[in-house]
């Protein structure tokens, strides 16, 4: 298979740094424009390209790195010696092309598909700078092909030619593209590895696949970074809307499946599509890419058009838009009101006197049947009448309008009888009646059913009988029982009212205590007033002498400091009380 890859290397292009989107990478990976300019220019072939920053797995080299307004742009080449290693792990019938649709893929294109989706990002490795250090020409270490780099906007675009890789970036100006084309043409003799170690490549790829299994939002990240890099029409990267390849689903080889395989195109629906269970067994899809894209959008063919665009009767709409259109259509149907019939229909209704057979006795859904007079201007009392419209073989059963219905009556209501005795019969549009929509009637009926069920349930609970255990609705649970077996019931907090109720003290005892306290307070105030004229210094001396005498008589232990402190506290309180009494007396 490697002999069919008729080129020596593949071009790869992409941004290594997007200056305006470096917040998520962290300060350690932040690279300013001044630092990039200090490390430029780079000589072709001096910076290697490897896989997942593995120095032992070099697969290409960098041709040039340019400082552009959006960020640091890289152009390099990758050896096609990777092609036989990649394609050896793909079954022969997995990659296919529909010749009838004009999709013929070469081995180079198949390799580009695999490379674009297995290693879709670029990652720059640079030397760690000291504080206030200016980068030199050895600042850039290598460029890695990886799953997702730390820096945002670093999407790798591969191509068999330089124009195919560079042309995917819409923000590049014409002079910049011409400069890159010139470098690619001049440096196309850059040395790339002609032979690669299969065990080393296999080890690195296995390591990458294991790490990539934990990237749940890989497709979303790729699409976001693709927009940051101004890549809107990639050719091979399948985390997008335009693809040119499908991976065939394994099924039994039967003539029916073979026909389906030839007729069904490469489009696929998202994983949440409501029509997923109705897909044919032989439908081609991209299961390996569905988990990566997670985009919920339909895939298209190589030229960007629909697979069945030649029929000009198919329009591809995103699933979210299709669901919103269905919801809006349902709301419009529910909000419609009956319209008045035309005069021709009223005339045909009045002139028709035939009787419908029981099998054709239909009635619009959602409307209540009248008990006596069922239709407008029937030929007689309690007569089942249907207008001539219902005898039309093309009639599909939808009631065109709601006729005027008079209340129940015992008089015949034939139009001739009514006009000869009471004048002209009123037309169908004379008395417009506002009928509720089907949606409103459904909601009202559901509410009525719910209320009836609740009332029935309450009635059943009120009629509960201990003698009939089958009517027992629920087990009686005490407040002290645990909810789960083995669960400890927490002790309930007892309120003040419950404490008073438990003590059962008479109310009079509390009032007596309050009165006793008031009398005691009055006595203390009177004593303080009489003692306010005494000398505070002599009083203090007496207290100190008494305390010294008491302390001398007692033994020295740990309680003596406490007693001295209590005496000082009492003296302080007396002084405050005396001052308060003096203030009240003044």
UniProtKB/Swiss-Prot annotation:
Active-site residues from the entry: 53 (charge relay system), 123 (charge relay system), 142 (charge relay system)
Gene Ontology BP term (one): nuclear capsid assembly
EC numbers, comma separated: 3.4.21.97
Region (Interaction with major capsid protein): 566-586, 567-586
Alphabetical UniProt keywords: Host cytoplasm, Host nucleus, Hydrolase, Phosphoprotein, Protease, Serine protease, Viral capsid assembly, Viral release from host cell
Biased composition (Basic and acidic residues): 251-263
Region (Interaction with pAP): 312-331
GO cellular component, one term: host cell nucleus
Any one GO MF annotation of this record: serine-type endopeptidase activity
Domain of life: Viruses
Region Disordered, annotated ranges: 251-288, 330-364, 458-486, 530-586
Chain intervals with Polar residues compositional bias: 264-284
Site feature Cleavage, where: 239-240, 558-559
Domains (record comment): Region of interaction between pPR and pAP is called Amino conserved domain (ACD). The region of interaction with major capsid protein is called carboxyl conserved domain (CCD).
Family: Belongs to the herpesviridae capsid scaffolding protein family.
Protein name: Capsid scaffolding protein
